[in-house]
Amino acid sequence: MTRMRYVKMDRIMNHMLIHALREVFRQEKEQGLPVDTTRDLVLKRAEQEEGKLYLTEAEHSKSVEALNQLRDTYLKNGRYSDGIDSVLLKIMKSRYRPYRGRGR
């Protein structure tokens, strides 16, 4: 049993996170950086519709980075970032919980 960060996600939060991660994935791919963590996290989020999201430390930091970049883009273009802010704060405030995996 490992300890991972737990976030309760709904459909809108899920779509915002996937959108932000796709942008980071594209940027990393263009720059020739390793994209394994980002790709795995996008696939993990795409498989799950709603509900519980368990994040490792690398996935947590990648999610915060991606949402922050999306927020900066919105602010630069003069758009509101209220929805992104709420998702970002929820992920940043996430707490550790025991995670047993699929084979409970």
Segments from the language model and where they lie:
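Positively charged, low-complexity terminal tracts
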Residues: 1-104
